[in-house]
């Protein structure tokens, strides 16, 4: 009986080393319920005015918009969500997915404002208005949503400082299936541009843009919510989607190499054998 532990250890050492040589991997693949009849696209305004904030160290409009987009995506776990940016045009950044890791990574690392920091502080030049919400007409025209998505939601995260929208926007959003549209506005009259650390005198928020945003929303049959009403916007999105058919979508989890752990485990019986030999 005393030889049994020795025999077991002699068998375990080559077995564990052989297993380690096979480089085993633990694959944490999971499945998630995904709606087959619904999709959403989140469009974030990346015009320079989205850098405005309440102070030099306060969060910018874009930072708050990214956070709100993350909150809204997590509130719709079964809805595939795509991401795009808006300035003079609309540019997709991520295809619709229910994998929150993808949307979180794109929101954190990819969506920003080009030319955010000028080479020298602007003191006399009034920023040019470049944002055009009329560019949203490309969403229904360019088939952002597949035919299978009968429930379509567009959420636009913007400060509403936009050029007037032309008739093309209204025509585009008359297509069927209809695209439900929510505008989530990030704006305050006291905000300024602090890109260089001091307020740029060339930029002062204009309250008149609120009416222009309301006009654009009316043209597409949408609704406008302020960032303080994020919960109301979330409820509106949830009510719009309701319930529907789903399918199980597999998602690859983290792949963990087990070779180091198996190799380490092989040293346990080996250490036992060395200990017995020295007795």
Protein language model features and the residues they cover:
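C-terminal signal-anchor/stop-transfer transmembrane helix together with its immediate cytosolic
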Residues: 1-32, 243-279
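VWA/integrin I-like adhesion module and closely mimicked acidic/polar interface patches used
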Residues: 124-128, 134-135, 142, 160-215, ...
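Membrane-embedded segments
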Residues: 23-150
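Extracytoplasmic/secreted cell-surface and envelope-processing proteins
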Residues: 51-54, 91-94, 162-167, 191-194, ...
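DG-centered beta-turn motif at the end of beta-strands
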Residues: 17, 45-47, 65, 83-88, ...
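A conserved amphipathic helix/loop scaffold
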Residues: 205, 235-250
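Extended, hydrophilic extramembrane loops/domains of integral membrane proteins
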Residues: 211-241
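Short glycine/serine/threonine/alanine-rich loop segments
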Residues: 79, 179, 221-224
